[in-house]
Amino acid sequence: LELRPRARYSLQLRARLNGPTYQGPWSAWSPPARVSTGSETAWITLVTALLLVLSLSALLGLLLLKWQFPAHYRRLRHALWPSLPDLHRVLGQYLRDTAALSPSKATVTDSCEEVEPSLLEILPKSSESTPLPLCPSQPQMDYRGLQPCLRTMPLSVCPPMAETGSCCTTHIANHSYLPLSYWQ
């Protein structure tokens, strides 16, 4: 049943017994009752007023509890908002307990640095100017060259001059393992 807001209605009722035990005719009509409906916003006003009264009474009750019974107030506050543990105290005690159980660590006072072998070996300048073996037919060196034989290949620091007249220095022809005496 939908009723329009701010309307007046007239109601009359009648009843009839209609069940498994009692059955009967309709009763007479009741006297008319006049009813007027409220506005749509009436319930919003009622709920707002009710919430305002309840919140103010709860606040007043908490203030009275705090002033008159501080022990009960602290107990209620602790039940509603439990306090967080102090992590410095809790974890500090835990770390002290575990440090007491663990064996003491050995301290190194004089630490020696381990010298790693170098991948590059610097040889002293020899007085004789004998060419080093560069071909497989000659005795092998301790290291491996990237190109098998360079004896017959002419070495140049720069390729021929370009049209711009500048020397390109990016061409090293993979001679990074050749001794410097061979370049002269």
UniProtKB/Swiss-Prot annotation:
PANTHER family: CYTOKINE RECEPTOR, THROMBOPOIETIN RECEPTOR
Domain notes: The WSXWS motif appears to be necessary for proper protein folding and thereby efficient intracellular transport and cell-surface receptor binding.
Protein name per the record: Myeloproliferative leukemia protein
Family as reported in the entry's similarity comment: Belongs to the type I cytokine receptor family. Type 1 subfamily.
Short motif WSXWS motif, span: 26-30
Localization terms from the record: Membrane
GO cellular component, one term: membrane
Gene3D superfamilies: Immunoglobulins
Signal peptide: none
Function: Truncated form of the receptor for thrombopoietin.
UniProt keyword annotations, A-Z: Membrane, Oncogene, Receptor, Transmembrane, Transmembrane helix
Protein topology in the membrane: Single-pass membrane protein
Keyword flag Membrane: yes
Note: This protein is synthesized as an Env-Mpl polyprotein.
Record field: transmembrane: 44-64
Span(s) of short sequence motif Box 1 motif: 80-88
InterPro entries associated with the record: FN3_sf, Ig-like_fold
Example of a GO MF term: thrombopoietin receptor activity
